[in-house]
Amino acid sequence: MQTRNAFSWLKKQITRSISVSLMIYILTRTSISSAYPIFAQQGYENPREATGRIVCANCHLANKPVEIEVPQAVLPDTVFEAVVRIPYDMQLKQVLANGKKGGLNVGAVLILPEGFELAPSDRISPEMKEKIGNLSFQSYRPNKKNILVIGPVPGKKYSEITFPILSPDPATKKDVHFLKYPIYVGGNRGRGQIYPDGSKSNNTVYNATAAGIVSKIIRKEKGGYEITITDASEGRQVVDIIPPGPELLVSEGESIKFDQPLTSNPNVGGFGQGDAEIVLQDPLRVQGLLFFLASVILAQIFLVLKKKQFEKVQLAEMNF
């Protein structure tokens, strides 16, 4: 009986431990994912707004360049490279969530035409796999295979990202046609300045929420500050909380205005977007073009031969 009770108690403890561990894992994963660019998947059905703006710009406020390179034209059911470049100064360090400095991560979203999608691994050549490295791409939504996201990944290693893309075949996909299509890309380097809920991260500037005198500055044990602003005319006090990371620009006794920066702007990253065009080429059209070029070349050759033959006949008549 005691053995059965002991076994039952042990079983309950193991079950409880597993449940707690699973809960911690889920919470940790959620907090981590919400801090990175792909959180847009959770809040937006489509990453590109009707205005053409990519939603990543809502959280990454600084404007930075991004480049995309794709072939001018591709044939149906072929794998090609879409190369996205996210340039930045590799010597830069960003403010991390804990207030310390670290390297920049990068991320990208690639919006392909309907029908285009990530190439399956068995269709990717060894040379292309070497360019891709250890990157793991995912669809923006299960039903939106033409929109791909990647990141965050180390910027020093992946400031150039190669997407392996499979072109559609109009013979099997009736809604796809041989046309010129646009491709849109968004790329960021570094952390954002605003979280999905609208709150600020520690990677941005903090402004005064009231005008008055800085009456007290308390440096918090884990980093950051509590700044007390006293409005002498109204006799009220406002406390602004500064997280670890940004550098303080004001001192006690200083008179400040409403919305005046209390800190520096630590952000060294930013987001950019661009576009390109690609033609889904009809193989029959290519064959027709090659046939036409071959016929033109043959016609030129026959014309030259005919001209030489005519010159020989003329020369023979003159000698006669």
From Swiss-Prot:
Note accompanying the cofactor annotation: Binds 1 heme group covalently.
Parts of the chain that traverse the membrane: 286-305
Binding site for heme: 36, 56, 59-60
Membrane topology qualifier: Single-pass membrane protein
Pfam families per record: Apocytochr_F_C, Apocytochr_F_N
Localization of this protein: Plastid, Chloroplast thylakoid membrane
Any single biological process term in GO: photosynthesis
GO cellular component: chloroplast thylakoid membrane
Keyword presence, Electron transport: yes
GO molecular-function term, one example from the UniProt record: iron ion binding
Cofactor(s) of this protein: heme
Alphabetized UniProt keyword annotations: Chloroplast, Electron transport, Heme, Iron, Membrane, Metal-binding, Photosynthesis, Plastid, Signal, Thylakoid, Transmembrane, Transmembrane helix, Transport
Gene3D superfamilies: 2.40.50.100, Cytochrome f large domain (2.60.40.830), Single helix bin (1.20.5.700)
Cleavable signal peptide: 1-35
Quaternary structure note: The 4 large subunits of the cytochrome b6-f complex are cytochrome b6, subunit IV (17 kDa polypeptide, petD), cytochrome f and the Rieske protein, while the 4 small subunits are PetG, PetL, PetM and PetN. The complex functions as a dimer.
Function noted in UniProt: Component of the cytochrome b6-f complex, which mediates electron transfer between photosystem II (PSII) and photosystem I (PSI), cyclic electron flow around PSI, and state transitions.
Annotated family: Belongs to the cytochrome f family.
Protein name: Cytochrome f
